[in-house]
């Protein structure tokens, strides 16, 4: 069947191919259109055949990898179908020339293949029986070659004339028609009017297989055109593999669009620091961590950055790379050089306060100055309530707790906690050894000449723009005069409470005082429900009750050894302490009496004035307590005289007990004497109840008293005051 179909196609094509080519060329030259159908000799028994001409130059490459069936068809066409007379009449450029290259069946490189490229016009006759036959032959050859059934065949579109369609044929023979929207836009069809116009060839990469399909009268035929590349080694790529390659490709990086006039800045997430470079931000972030990777190999000190380590090493080696251009000074760091030039040469103050006219050379001093406006004191002592605006003053204050004295007098080797105190010591104690430089404008005496120049420049130089006093409206053009004027406001209590008579010198004290009126307690404990008006009280509460590692400070009295948690409490106790026995002196007794009298006075003021004097308790003033005589104990008669005992300090009289109504004031205030007592059981004759009576036993002299004395004693017992029973009366009752 295949051979008969091929012979019929070749016989019919031989007779009209040359004439058809000439007619088509003439019609295009004249602007005419091609006829829709060609009148060909038809055989009614075999069925009509229609021949469609594809007038284009196609480069065909014949290789050993082509299908054997197609090679056989081309061989038959070349051998037995062309007549000798037809070959002589047809031009050489219009004849299909096929050449078979026999190659060994072994793996060879693509570069060793010999390619034969012949431009041929392809004319394809279409028959009703040829489509099924070619499709069946193709499926048989695919099964013989052992190709994967799941591997689809790749189809690529080419610029096609009108009447053609692009289809995609799978491995199992399924045919899929591509829509017109999926194809690339075609060129304008006006090129058909000009026979000399040739459409531009489109460059395609790795075109493996293309299928052209056209239909006429319900008959369609697929034509495959193969194109092999020299660099391809593994055959045709499948459509699935192509999708995988596209899926694995990394998306392009988004381009950074920089807007003109906008400066890019980096901001720290932990504070308000901003910088124009990423490297500066990375260096700043190290300040929020304790990481110090760069270590000095000489002293072991660690630093956050290499620059700080390099500057530190210069201190070991004595290298000063930064030299001042205006003088002979040299410095370790560039910051020291800039600060030196501003102080000594340029006198530039770039950091200015936004609230007043203050300007500074260093930004740290500006921050400290701004805290004087806001009242902020972030640096607080952990041992007391002291708070400072800068770290320098806090360190100086901490020396009062630790006892450190880093400053030493070079003459007498006395040590001091502050440098100013040491300078004053030298000026006062060692005036003969110190050169004095007197200021011509004030009474200041300075030890060094350079310090005198600094003093004159800072204190007595004329300021064009006068400075205003921070406490009043006075304006001064000299800093020294301004400072002396502000000292007059030092002890002035400028801040006064609008709800009471309280006044203070500092604003922060007034803020804390007003909280006593409003009841505001903004500082709350995170572990309990306590709230406080001051942060110092909150910190003290937290350490005392919630910090397990807190050890309270112990202030020991040097006289008695008693410990206190506060220094002022210990100092007040030491003023009244008498010694290790814990007996307080005269000052202590007076202090306690005065405190008790003050409390009674405050209590008496709070009582209602409507109370009667009879019901009210008599209050004792301090004078009454002091004038009240102390009760003295009469000495007992001794039978034999004894030498007097050594003098002992007389203990102060104990405070009088509170008086009660209905009893004489004299008896309750008498101190109890330690005398021997005896318990006597007395039985009542009427009821028979037994009562225990405590009786004091007095020591009697060895000699028996006379009878007259007994009678006097019995008479004395009968005259007991207030009708109370005395031990003598009880004994006489028992005798009776």
Swiss-Prot record:
Pfam families: zf-C2H2, zf-C2H2_16. There is a cross-link at residues 74, 698 (Glycyl lysine isopeptide (Lys-Gly) (interchain with G-Cter in SUMO)). PROSITE patterns: ZINC_FINGER_C2H2_1, ZINC_FINGER_C2H2_2. There is a cross-link at residues 18, 219, 698 (Glycyl lysine isopeptide (Lys-Gly) (interchain with G-Cter in SUMO2)). It is found in: Nucleus, Nucleoplasm; Chromosome; Chromosome, Centromere. Keywords: Acetylation, Activator, Centromere, Chromatin regulator, Chromosome, Chromosome partition, DNA-binding, Isopeptide bond, Metal-binding, Nucleus, Phosphoprotein, Repeat, Repressor, Transcription, Transcription regulation, Tumor suppressor, Ubl conjugation, Zinc, Zinc-finger. Its main location: nucleus. One of its GO terms (molecular function) is cis-regulatory region sequence-specific DNA binding. The modification Phosphothreonine is found at residues 289, 317, 374. Residues 638-656 have a biased composition (Pro residues). GO terms for cellular component: chromosome, centromeric region; condensed chromosome; male germ cell nucleus; nucleolus; nucleoplasm; nucleus. The keyword Repeat applies. Residues 202-211, 593-604 have a biased composition (Basic residues). Residues 610-637, 703-713 have a biased composition (Acidic residues). The modification N-acetylmethionine is found at residue 1. A zinc finger (C2H2-type) spans 266-288, 294-316, 322-345, 351-373, 379-401, 407-430, 437-460, 467-489, 495-517, 523-546, 555-577. Residues 667-686 have a biased composition (Polar residues). GO terms for biological process: cardiac muscle cell development; cardiac muscle cell differentiation; chromatin looping; chromatin organization; chromosome segregation; DNA methylation-dependent constitutive heterochromatin formation; epigenetic regulation of gene expression; gene expression. Interacts with CHD8. Interacts with LLPH. Interacts with CENPE. Interacts with BRD2; promoting BRD2 recruitment to chromatin. Belongs to the CTCF zinc-finger protein family. This is Transcriptional repressor CTCF. It comes from Mus musculus.
């Amino acid at each position: 069947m295949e051979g008969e179909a091929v012979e019929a196609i070749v016989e019919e094509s031989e007779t009209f191919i040359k004439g058809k080519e000439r007619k088509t060329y003439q019609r295009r030259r004249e602007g005419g259109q091609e006829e829709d159908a060609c009148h060909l000799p038809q055989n009614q028994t075999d069925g009509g055949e229609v021949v469609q001409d594809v007038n284009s130059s196609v480069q065909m490459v014949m290789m050993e990898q082509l299908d054997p069936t197609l090679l056989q068809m081309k061989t038959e066409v070349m051998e037995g179908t062309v007549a000798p007379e037809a070959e002589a009449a047809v031009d050489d450029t219009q004849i299909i020339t096929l050449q078979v290259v026999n190659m060994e069946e072994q793996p060879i490189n693509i570069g060793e293949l010999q390619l034969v490229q012949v431009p041929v016009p392809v004319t394809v006759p279409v028959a009703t029986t040829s489509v099924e036959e070619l499709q069946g032959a193709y499926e048989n050859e695919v099964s013989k070659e052992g190709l994967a059934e799941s591997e689809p065949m790749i189809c690529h579109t080419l610029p096609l004339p009108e009447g053609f369609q692009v289809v995609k044929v799978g491995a199992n023979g399924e045919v899929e028609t591509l829509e017109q929207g999926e194809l690339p836009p075609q060129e304008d069809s006006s090129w058909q009017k000009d026979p000399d116009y040739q459409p531009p060839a489109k460059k395609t990469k790795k075109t493996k297989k293309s299928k052209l399909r056209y239909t006429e009268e319900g008959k369609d035929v697929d034509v495959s055109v193969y194109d092999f590349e020299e660099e391809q080694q593994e055959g045709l790529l499948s459509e699935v593999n192509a999708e995988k390659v596209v899926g694995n490709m990394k998306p392009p990086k988004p381009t950074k669009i920089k807007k003109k006039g906008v400066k890019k800045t980096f901001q720290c997430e932990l504070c308000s620091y901003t910088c124009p470079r990423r490297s500066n931000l990375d260096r700043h972030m190290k300040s929020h961590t304790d990481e110090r990777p760069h270590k000095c190999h000489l002293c072991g000190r660690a630093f956050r950055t290499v620059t700080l380590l390099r500057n530190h090493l210069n201190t070991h080696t004595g290298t000063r790379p930064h030299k001042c251009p205006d003088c002979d000074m040299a410095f370790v760091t560039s910051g020291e050089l800039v600060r030196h030039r501003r102080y000594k040469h340029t006198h530039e103050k770039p950091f200015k306060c936004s609230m007043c006219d203050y300007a500074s050379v260093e930004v740290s001093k500006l921050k400290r100055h701004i805290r004087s406006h806001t009242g902020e004191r972030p640096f607080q002592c952990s041992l007391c309530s002291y708070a400072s605006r800068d770290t320098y003053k806090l360190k100086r204050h901490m020396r009062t707790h630790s006892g450190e004295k880093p400053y030493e007098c070079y003459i007498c080797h006395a040590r001091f906690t502050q440098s100013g105190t040491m300078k004053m010591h030298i000026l006062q104690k060692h005036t003969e050894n110190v050169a004095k430089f007197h200021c011509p404008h004030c009474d200041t005496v300075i030890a060094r000449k350079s310090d005198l120049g600094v003093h004159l420049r800072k204190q007595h130089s004329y300021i064009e723009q006068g400075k205003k006093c921070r406490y009043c409206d006075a304006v001064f053009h000299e800093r020294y005069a301004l400072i002396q004027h502000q000292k007059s406001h030092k002890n002035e209590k400028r801040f006064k409470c609008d709800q009471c008579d309280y006044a203070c010198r500092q604003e922060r004290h007034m803020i804390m005082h007003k909280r006593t009126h409003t009841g505001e307690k903004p500082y709350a404990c995170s572990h309990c429900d306590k709230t406080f008006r001051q942060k110092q009280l909150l910190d003290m509460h937290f350490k005392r009750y919630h910090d397990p590692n807190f050890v309270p400070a112990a202030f020991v009295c040097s006289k008695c050894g008693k410990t206190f948690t506060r220094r002022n409490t210990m100092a007040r106790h030491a003023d009244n302490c008498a010694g290790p026995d814990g007996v307080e002196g005269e000052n202590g007794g007076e202090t306690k009496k005065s405190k008790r009298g003050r409390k009674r006075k405050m209590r008496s003021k709070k009582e209602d004035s409507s109370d009667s004097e009879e019901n009210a308790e008599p209050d004792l003033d301090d004078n009454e307590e002091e004038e009240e005589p102390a009760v003295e104990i009469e000495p007992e008669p001794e039978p034999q005289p004894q030498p007097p005992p050594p003098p002992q300090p007389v203990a102060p009289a104990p405070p009088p007990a509170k008086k009660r109504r209905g009893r004489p004031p004299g008896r309750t205030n008498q101190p109890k004497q330690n005398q021997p007592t005896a318990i006597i059981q007395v039985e009542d004759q009427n009821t028979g109840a037994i009562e225990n009576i405590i009786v004091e036993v007095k020591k009697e002299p060895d000699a028996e008293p006379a009878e007259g004395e007994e009678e006097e004693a019995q008479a004395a017992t009968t005259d007991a005051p207030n009708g109370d029973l005395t031990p003598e009366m009880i004994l006489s009752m028992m005798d009776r």
